[in-house]
Amino acid sequence: MDFNTVSSFQDILMRMSKMQLRSSSEGLNGMVTQFESLKIYRDSLGEAVMRMGDLHYLQNRNGKWREQLGQKFEEIRWLIEEVRHKLKITENSFEQITFMQALQLLLEVEQEMRTFSFQLI
């Protein structure tokens, strides 16, 4: 394929991908926002693991950090189930690819949160 054909094909795929995301359920934006929040929380756990004495720091800063951690795990499990459900009911291949990638990211974030939290406990 020549460069123009490849470029045009990529452009079409991008436009179709954007159209499919807009046509997905309204809850998708909320799911993305929640996912971003969970990624930030995961990053803060990772930073806490790297600093010395952070278990005490976390306990002093937030006496209910274990409860907060439990809530974050509930959130990510809910998001995983939502994405799995949408994946099952979606017939459009572009949406299926998008939801498969989202599911993979969610599972990675959940695993990293578990790893960091076990190191803190």
Curated annotation (Swiss-Prot):
It is found in: Virion; Host nucleus. A motif (Nuclear export signal) lies at residues 12-21, 85-94. Disulfide bonds: none annotated. Keywords: Host nucleus, Host-virus interaction, Transport, Virion. Pfam families: Flu_NS2. One of its GO terms (cellular component) is host cell nucleus. Average number present in a viral particle is estimated to be 130-200 molecules. Belongs to the influenza viruses NEP family. Mediates the nuclear export of encapsidated genomic RNAs (ribonucleoproteins, RNPs). Acts as an adapter between viral RNPs complexes and the nuclear export machinery of the cell. Possesses no intrinsic RNA-binding activity, but includes a C-terminal M1-binding domain. This domain is believed to allow recognition of RNPs bound to the protein M1. This is Nuclear export protein. It comes from Influenza A virus (strain A/Swine/Wisconsin/1/1961 H1N1). The gene is NS.
